[in-house]
């Protein structure tokens, strides 16, 4: 069953580019002159929808993305080059062998770059 998570944005095109490049996904649909843009690998799973809104983000997100990566340094450099911010520069969090870095996209929405513990696969539950 398809599912959407909607992320508000004052200026969706830069975030569309950011998340497409970070997740190696593509624009699946865009309508109402770009007010809504859905991103994903296909239309079957979870898709991110960027929704244009007039107001800027205020406060911490109540939910965030964990982008699962094979290693942390390359994706961190890529995210920074695409306009992300490392929220705790130089800090890597760790719990039970899992590691993550807290980041923010170009509009300040929090996400984590997440490295699975050795021997775990992408289906394992996340500890944070």
Label for each model-derived stretch:
Residues 2-10, 28-31, 38-40, 55-128:
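Vicinal oxygen chelate
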Residues 33-46:
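C-terminal "cap" of GNAT-fold acetyltransferases
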Residues 12-36:
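N-terminal first-folded block
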Residues 15, 19, 79, 108:
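Conserved active-site tyrosine of GNAT-family acetyltransferases
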């Amino acid at each position: 069953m398809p599912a959407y998570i909607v992320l508000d944005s004052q200026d969706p095109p830069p975030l569309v580019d950011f998340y497409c490049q970070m997740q190696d996904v593509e624009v699946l649909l865009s309508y109402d002159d770009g007010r809504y843009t859905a991103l994903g690998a296909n239309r079957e799973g979870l898709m991110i929808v960027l929704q244009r809104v007039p107001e800027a983000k205020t406060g911490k997100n109540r939910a965030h993305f964990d982008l699962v990566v094979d290693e942390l340094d390359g994706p961190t450099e890529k995210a920074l080059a695409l306009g992300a911010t490392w929220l705790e520069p130089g800090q890597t969090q760790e719990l039970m062998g899992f590691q993550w870095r807290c980041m923010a996209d170009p509009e300040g929405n929090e996400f984590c770059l997440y490295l699975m513990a050795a021997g775990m696969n992408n289906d394992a539950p996340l500890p944070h």
